[in-house]
Amino acid sequence: MTDYTIRPMTIEDYEEVYALWTHIQGFGIRSIDDSKEDIVRFLERNPNTSAVAICDNKIVGNILCGHDGRQGSFYHVCVAKDYRRHGIATKMAVFCMRALQDAGINKITLIAFSENEGGNAFWRKIGWTSRSDDVNYYEFVLNENNITKFVQGE
């Protein structure tokens, strides 16, 4: 494998990154979060925290990374299959960690689907702690129908 570089993701990377996302097994893309418009908003809020890995003049890895002022989150951590096991994910993660530290953030969370055996093995191997025994993950899609149901207590 030739050398690779890690750099901040920009919106100009979106089409190539999105294409990468669609080829990763054990990975979830949601139209509600992952449209170009949504990623523009995400990158504007977190301009230097997401990363892409470039090798052979193409994007072969990506981490969407952001924070809310309190803790950081990794989203869509991926490396193209033919480029795995060369330290790319680790280098991207460190790039994002340093960007979060520069922003005063001292904790990161991520979600890995339970069936994503390779991803889960990677995070355990590099020292991340699974909280699946004491934390439930909930989500609530913000739309008028759901908010009305919430208010009505349904």
Describe each PLM feature range:
Residues R85-R98, K125:
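Conserved acetyl-CoA-binding loop-helix of GNAT-fold acetyltransferases
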Residues V77-R84, A112-F113:
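A short, internal acetyl-CoA/4′-phosphopantetheine-binding micro-motif in the GNAT/acyltransferase core
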